[in-house]
């Protein structure tokens, strides 16, 4: 038996032996849906790190750059559809094997695939919120507002980048118009957790509560370089839970894994979860 078949057989056994699986997914779970990931096989950034919270809140130029890239990128990101990995994980959940699926992604593709008990750890890009009055709204109308205010930008075409942005390096963002909150005139931000921003406590508590009842952990498409997800794997290892990962390249928790499959998530899960 070659190593590929051996890995798949081992993963089938791992999943078959679990009744209360804690699943953690990252950007690699959505690459087959056309959404790029952040890191290379060594866990290093493929491009500049995403904008951080302080920069976004601290100046109009940073917000203009962010919203210009997001507005152009949304046309691609908003049309992304679940791939075989999302559908396979949804099937596991529908069979009652998944206690909670925690995703670091903001694309809502697990829900689109019919997933149950999904926790959006880092929020969701299909909603926006005001940082002053907490007004919230869907991305569709906000996207329309952005495009009306910036018709010359709306015509641009660019390659997709992670988290719904577009590659617009070299552009002059100084004339991009960033609309204000329709209620109070405050700063509007996507309802996602930026770098430098804290994950809401209730989400972290819900994840830890599910982990306490889990009998195994499956990591899908994450290098675990971000502490926000890595901490749950750390806690699982301390509790003696078996941990498996499907990921191309190294993860921060390689020494904690009982099993690792270094192949594309969609291919692997389509084969082991019929």
From Swiss-Prot:
Active-site residues annotated for this sequence: 122
InterPro entries: DHS-like_NAD/FAD-binding_dom, NAD-dep_sirtuin_deacylases, Sirtuin, Sirtuin_cat_small_dom_sf, Sirtuin_class_II, Ssirtuin_cat_dom
Record keyword Metal-binding present: yes
Compartment list: Cytoplasm
Positions contributing to Zn(2+) binding: 130, 133, 181, 184
Any one Pfam family match given in the protein's UniProt record, by short name: SIR2
Catalytic reaction equation(s): N(6)-acetyl-L-lysyl-[protein] + NAD(+) + H2O = 2''-O-acetyl-ADP-D-ribose + nicotinamide + L-lysyl-[protein]
UniProtKB keywords: Cytoplasm, Metal-binding, NAD, Transferase, Zinc
Enzyme Commission identifier(s): 2.3.1.286
Deacetylase sirtuin-type domain segment(s): 1-274
UniProt remark on cofactor binding: Binds 1 zinc ion per subunit.
Keyword Cell inner membrane in annotation: no
Residues involved in NAD(+) binding: 26-46, 104-107, 221-223, 247-249, 265
GO cellular component, one term: cytoplasm
PANTHER family per UniProt: NAD-DEPENDENT PROTEIN DEACYLASE SIRTUIN-5, MITOCHONDRIAL-RELATED (PTHR11085:SF10)
Function of the protein: NAD-dependent protein deacetylase which modulates the activities of several enzymes which are inactive in their acetylated form.
Family as reported in the entry's similarity comment: Belongs to the sirtuin family. Class II subfamily.
Protein name listed in UniProt: NAD-dependent protein deacetylase
